[in-house]
């Protein structure tokens, strides 16, 4: 995120306090004592933390919720600690379905660097409440088994641990749960304790599916330090039709542009259903409630204009990928719908567009339009392709082509590689020269 975008962000000052805004935006599913938490957030400057385990090379949309909660709390004056789990990432928190595959220390170390760089883009590291990055390998990695069992494990009761929701599900499954993953909640509890001791951290935020791990920390601090600390669990976001949010055709939407292009990212948000778009604006943008109310009215009265979706897609893609990449994604989207010029797109954006379309890799001697249309599946036979060309039903890079002898020339190839082909209004594809 650019400094310009970061500096332009602000909370909605029509709310009495940040707690009320978080609740209105639907960002609180569960918490420790609500009255005490609201009072602390309103009257004190809290140091808080959110943890991110390096179980992949990139964060995804589920993590984006946490990153934006961190930023909202920072804008309210509180001090963020971004924790990357260099130690817990070697263990893996228990999933509801099966045991995680353990990654090598070398892989985890690389992923720690990647995640740290992503997290840093969403926070300010300047001013009185500057963010700080921490790694739990710095304390857990130095602890002996004896220290862990005597100083930490002694405060955990197995009866309580097995009642944690995910642990209970795994215990009742055919696969069960390993001692390694069963112990994860002890390690996350230790993180909160260490951050409380080192930085005076009194609040942890995370997804509600991690609630058992979050409360492991609050309980440990109460037993060891005699203090009451806080935790907030954000809701797991689902679509109005009951499907899981954050997936596209079963694949996670990553924040790394190499794993999910800015164009594909933009398209994901642009395709948000009318029934979901207002809630997404609340969670993922810094628009005020008055501004969001205006979009809610537009969705109700003029849904066909999709203004809310366009705004959502632009703002969130800008947050994650910057305005330059977002402008390219918008230009690509407009070109696909005949409202723009593919020639204005940079090569990376054009590649990402081609990846989302039916495409064919053809040699120079196969660039005649009859071959192109049949290879793309836009014509079932050469005779059908001839008919399409005779009727002027095909275009290349937005320019209509006609005649059986029509072909894509080298001059037509964008960046010397690609030609965008359309048949009629709905069939859009691409050819790549090989």
Which ranges hold each PLM region?
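NTP-dependent nucleotidyl-transfer catalytic core
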Residues: 1-210, 218, 225-230, 243
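Short alpha-helical patches at coil-to-helix transitions and adjacent helical residues
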Residues: 63-67, 142, 213-214, 310, ...
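Conserved nucleotide- and phosphate/pyrophosphate-binding catalytic cores
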Residues: 223-434
């Amino acid at each position: 995120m650019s400094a310009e975008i970061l500096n332009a962000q602000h909370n909605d000052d029509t709310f009495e306090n940040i707690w009320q805004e978080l609740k209105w935006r639907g960002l609180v599913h569960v918490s420790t004592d609500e009255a005490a938490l609201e009072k602390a957030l309103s009257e004190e400057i809290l140091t808080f933390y959110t943890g991110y385990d390096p179980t992949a090379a990139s964060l995804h949309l589920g993590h984006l919720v946490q990153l934006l909660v961190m930023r909202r709390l920072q804008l309210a004056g509180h001090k963020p600690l971004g924790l990357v789990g260099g130690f817990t990432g070697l263990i893996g928190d228990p999933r509801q379905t099966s045991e995680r595959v353990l990654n090598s220390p070398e892989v985890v170390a690389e992923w720690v660097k990647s995640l740290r760089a992503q997290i840093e883009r969403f926070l300010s590291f300047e001013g009185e409440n500057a963010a700080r990055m921490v790694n739990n390998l710095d304390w857990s990695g130095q602890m002996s088994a004896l220290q862990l069992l005597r100083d930490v494990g002694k405060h955990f009761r197995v009866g309580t641990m097995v009642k944690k929701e995910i642990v209970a599900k795994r215990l009742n499954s055919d696969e069960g749960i390993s001692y390694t993953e069963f112990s994860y909640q002890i390690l996350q509890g230790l993180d909160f304790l260490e951050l409380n001791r080192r930085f005076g951290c009194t609040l942890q935020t995370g997804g509600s599916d991690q609630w058992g791990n979050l409360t492991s920390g609050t309980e440990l601090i109460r037993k060891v330090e005699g203090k009451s600390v806080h935790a907030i669990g954000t809701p797991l976001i689902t679509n109005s039709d009951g499907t899981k949010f954050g997936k596209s055709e079963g694949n996670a939407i990553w924040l790394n542009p190499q794993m999910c292009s800015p164009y594909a990212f933009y398209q994901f948000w642009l395709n948000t259903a009318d029934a979901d778009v207002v809630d997404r604006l609340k969670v993922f943008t810094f628009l005020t409630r008055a501004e969001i109310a205006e979009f809610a009215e537009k969705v109700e009265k003029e849904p066909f204009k999709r203004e809310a979706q366009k705004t959502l897609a632009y703002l969130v893609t800008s947050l994650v990928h910057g305005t330059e990449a977002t402008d390219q994604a918008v230009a690509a989207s407009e070109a696909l719908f005949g409202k723009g010029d593919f020639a204005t797109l940079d090569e990376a954006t054009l590649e990402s567009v081609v990846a989302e379309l039916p495409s064919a890799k053809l040699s120079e001697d196969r660039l005649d339009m009859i071959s192109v249309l049949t290879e793309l599946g836009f014509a079932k036979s050469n005779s059908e392709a001839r008919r399409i060309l005779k009727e002027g039903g095909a275009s290349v890079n937005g320019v209509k082509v006609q005649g059986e002898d029509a072909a894509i020339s080298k001059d037509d190839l964008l960046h010397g590689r690609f030609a965008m082909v359309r048949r009629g209004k709905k069939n859009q594809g691409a050819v790549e020269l090989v």
